[in-house]
């Protein structure tokens, strides 16, 4: 298990994970939460390690990745093409480097390279990439890039070590620059040091003495940025003034990477700051940094008059932030997308914008609610809400009456030209598109591969975008976390496996709740459980014979058998796949133009395939009856009975009683109902059990027994 590796545990403390897919010769990072392309500079496109592992399966990615930022301590060293076919290091320079840098090392996805992760500081004179004559290469990064993670530990190096990376400078023969780049000094100021200090104090730019728990390095960097502006990037003057500040300490002169900690900090500030102070221009307002106090906010009257100063700065950048008092997380809306993030992630975003990391961020408080029929913001009973629903571009198109011909061909192929079922599905889909509500009915598409089941999902994904979860598998269903249901109109379950009784029970138990309940309980990693209104509608794709148990009285599922392979159809060409996706807008316009028959939205049809599933499900009743009669406790355990303990339906004492009841053949009614409900996935009354299991299969007869001194009705079997 990858999470058992100490290095991965260390990296997992940071919500900087992505997934990646190999496209041609490039590994492209993707957002693990929505499957869209990610950026190594956008924290909203990342997730925690659990979200990344779930996204890896959900979106069919090739692997995991970790994004390096300025706020984490990690440096990534990539040794490319250094392994032979036996996974031995073949390059002398790489062997020497590995002798010096003993930290977490793993084999790269290609199998011929090594990745080393170190906790440390990369010297600024080290070039990011060095190529060698033998075709190998060395790359080093500490921010603005992502690294692939395989978990294939090399040479037992499974932990991240804190090291002095100035050792990289000893590889000069391998074309790594060891000369410090000249510093560009732009000084327009004629003021002396005391005048600069006085000016900074009056402008609220002078730091206070750090307190216990303060991040000294961040305070150093923030003050150095200000000095770069006020001193015109004159490093000597910046250094003299820094030494007079409350931040000065022994670390400032500590030798680091061929220089000193202080010099490196000042050099970074000069590289970061764009403009400088010029007394002749009186351009004090050009300083890119707000005055700050010990809390990281402005230290002047502005703070008292406008506590939301930082919130407004973010608004000018197209970013709206609020604190959700229900989730206890920060909501952030950017580019018409809403995400919930931790305070640390928000601080990282703020740092990228204003060059400092405030400890406190004053923003409005709301409760985020997904309400398609509500305005962007509203208030009810004194509580302020912000709407998390944002229509996609294809949810705002003008209606038309004709469906694109090629989309019609796809649907006819899927439904085997069954006009009635196809009409019901289109009506169901149009209802979701127009009214954005839960229908209470799910559609199951079964049969051969290559019939267009996945293509239909891809088409709908183009229309609904973030309002649709796709490629949810059994692994997701078996997890305690269910973020894929959060604020979704359509959920696609892919390749649902039901090769055993326990799998079918799991799927049925979950689906029964999700399809019919008015609300859902959402569990996400590192977030409070939250109850939300249920808008979910389900499309299930499966190649299994029985994806889910269905009873004769079922009113939840429509089942379609798909046997027409697309490549065998006369109308299909090599361009048809892309042509169908290109007609997503046309199909959206058609859905917008349909006059929905609300009376048929929940209609289900007993198709031949559904009838076969019902018959198979009914045979399970016989199996339950036989297991009861045989007092076969192992059959019940193999078919998921232990789930009653996991769900806290019974306590440990009751669990022992229940098992004993099965093995002795005297089963109290209350336990019999629990047993049958757990196996079938539906709540059953004792009357139903007698009518459907006991009487037809002659399981036993009703009696009265004493339990804990009290008379209890029971069934005697066997």
From Swiss-Prot:
<dbReference type="InterPro" id="IPR054540">
    <property type="entry name" value="NrSPol-like_head"/>
</dbReference>
<dbReference type="GO" id="GO:0005524">
    <property type="term" value="F:ATP binding"/>
</dbReference>
<dbReference type="Pfam" id="PF19263">
    <property type="entry name" value="DUF5906"/>
</dbReference>
<keyword id="KW-0347">Helicase</keyword>
<feature type="binding site">
    <location>
        <position position="80"/>
    </location>
    <ligand>
        <name>Mg(2+)</name>
    </ligand>
</feature>
<feature type="active site" description="For polymerase and primase activities">
    <location>
        <position position="139"/>
    </location>
</feature>
<keyword id="KW-1194">Viral DNA replication</keyword>
<dbReference type="InterPro" id="IPR054468">
    <property type="entry name" value="NrSPol-like_HBD"/>
</dbReference>
<keyword id="KW-0547">Nucleotide-binding</keyword>
<dbReference type="GO" id="GO:0006260">
    <property type="term" value="P:DNA replication"/>
</dbReference>
<feature type="site" description="Involved in primer extension">
    <location>
        <position position="145"/>
    </location>
</feature>
<dbReference type="Pfam" id="PF22763">
    <property type="entry name" value="NrS1-1_pol-like_HBD"/>
</dbReference>
<feature type="binding site">
    <location>
        <position position="115"/>
    </location>
    <ligand>
        <name>Mg(2+)</name>
    </ligand>
</feature>
<keyword id="KW-0067">ATP-binding</keyword>
<dbReference type="InterPro" id="IPR045455">
    <property type="entry name" value="NrS-1_pol-like_helicase"/>
</dbReference>
<feature type="binding site">
    <location>
        <begin position="304"/>
        <end position="718"/>
    </location>
    <ligand>
        <name>DNA</name>
    </ligand>
</feature>
<dbReference type="GO" id="GO:0004386">
    <property type="term" value="F:helicase activity"/>
</dbReference>
<comment type="subunit">
    <text>homohexamer.</text>
</comment>
<feature type="active site" description="For polymerase activity">
    <location>
        <position position="78"/>
    </location>
</feature>
<keyword id="KW-0378">Hydrolase</keyword>
<protein>
    <recommendedName>
        <fullName>DNA Primase-polymerase</fullName>
        <ecNumber>2.7.7.-</ecNumber>
        <ecNumber>2.7.7.7</ecNumber>
        <ecNumber>3.6.4.12</ecNumber>
    </recommendedName>
</protein>
<feature type="site" description="Involved in sugar discrimination to select deoxynucleotides">
    <location>
        <position position="146"/>
    </location>
</feature>
<dbReference type="InterPro" id="IPR054541">
    <property type="entry name" value="NrSPol-like_tail"/>
</dbReference>
<feature type="active site" description="For polymerase activity">
    <location>
        <position position="115"/>
    </location>
</feature>
<dbReference type="Pfam" id="PF22761">
    <property type="entry name" value="NrS1-1_pol-like_head"/>
</dbReference>
<keyword id="KW-0235">DNA replication</keyword>
<feature type="region of interest" description="Polymerase">
    <location>
        <begin position="1"/>
        <end position="176"/>
    </location>
</feature>
<dbReference type="GO" id="GO:0016740">
    <property type="term" value="F:transferase activity"/>
</dbReference>
<feature type="binding site">
    <location>
        <position position="78"/>
    </location>
    <ligand>
        <name>Mg(2+)</name>
    </ligand>
</feature>
<comment type="function">
    <text>Multifunctional protein with primer synthesis, DNA polymerization, and DNA helicase activities. Recognizes a specific sequence motif 5'-TTTGGTTA-3' and initiates DNA synthesis.</text>
</comment>
<dbReference type="GO" id="GO:0016787">
    <property type="term" value="F:hydrolase activity"/>
</dbReference>
<feature type="region of interest" description="Helicase">
    <location>
        <begin position="404"/>
        <end position="593"/>
    </location>
</feature>
<dbReference type="GO" id="GO:0039693">
    <property type="term" value="P:viral DNA genome replication"/>
</dbReference>
<dbReference type="Pfam" id="PF22762">
    <property type="entry name" value="NrS1-pol-like_tail"/>
</dbReference>
<keyword id="KW-0808">Transferase</keyword>
<dbReference type="InterPro" id="IPR027417">
    <property type="entry name" value="P-loop_NTPase"/>
</dbReference>
<feature type="active site" description="For polymerase activity">
    <location>
        <position position="80"/>
    </location>
</feature>
<feature type="region of interest" description="Primase">
    <location>
        <begin position="1"/>
        <end position="292"/>
    </location>
</feature>
<keyword id="KW-0511">Multifunctional enzyme</keyword>
<feature type="binding site">
    <location>
        <position position="108"/>
    </location>
    <ligand>
        <name>Mg(2+)</name>
    </ligand>
</feature>
